[in-house]
Amino acid sequence: RCRNGEHIVIICGNNAKIERILRKEFHFNKRVHIIGYTNHVSLFMDACDVIYTKPGGLTSTESLVKNIPIVHTAPIPGCETANLHFFGARHLSVSSKHLAKQVQLGKALIENDSLREQMSKAQRRERKPEAAMQIVSLLEQLVSHE
């Protein structure tokens, strides 16, 4: 429920079933926006005050690079569990498997400047903006030695 004028954007991707369910559930609420597949995820992320996402590698890393406070939801066992532990241990995100706690965590990140700044500082410390170029350089070196 939006109480303070905020808007909630839910991006469902290719999950048409969940998109249909959410559209039915929130059709009356003009502050809840249900989006299916979009090529504009980055733009929606730029507008975020906080992001709720499962701890997949792509969205989690992009959120870190964009310095968006992250609330991780329940992971899919395996790689996402490892991502959840990695991000949590470094204070790059907060998490809970329980919806009510996730809401509390997100509100705290929005309302508590100190908490948000602590996560932001950790994200700036851990991100590696030159990683892609370093990988390309390494690959070039490996290819030139063959």
PLM features: what roles do these ranges have?
Residues A89-V94, H98-S114:
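C-terminal "capping" alpha-helix adjacent to the active site of nucleotide-linked donor transferases
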Residues V9, V71, V94:
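Conserved beta-strand positions in the Rossmann-like core of class I SAM-dependent methyltransferases
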Residues V41-A82:
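A donor-sugar binding/catalytic signature common to diverse glycosyltransferases
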Residues A82-A89:
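Active-site-proximal loop->helix
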Residues L115-P129:
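A short, well-ordered alpha-helix in the C-terminal region of glycosyltransferases
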Residues K128-E146:
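C-terminal alpha-helical cap of glycosyltransferases
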Residues R1-C48:
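Donor-nucleotide binding loops and adjacent catalytic segments primarily
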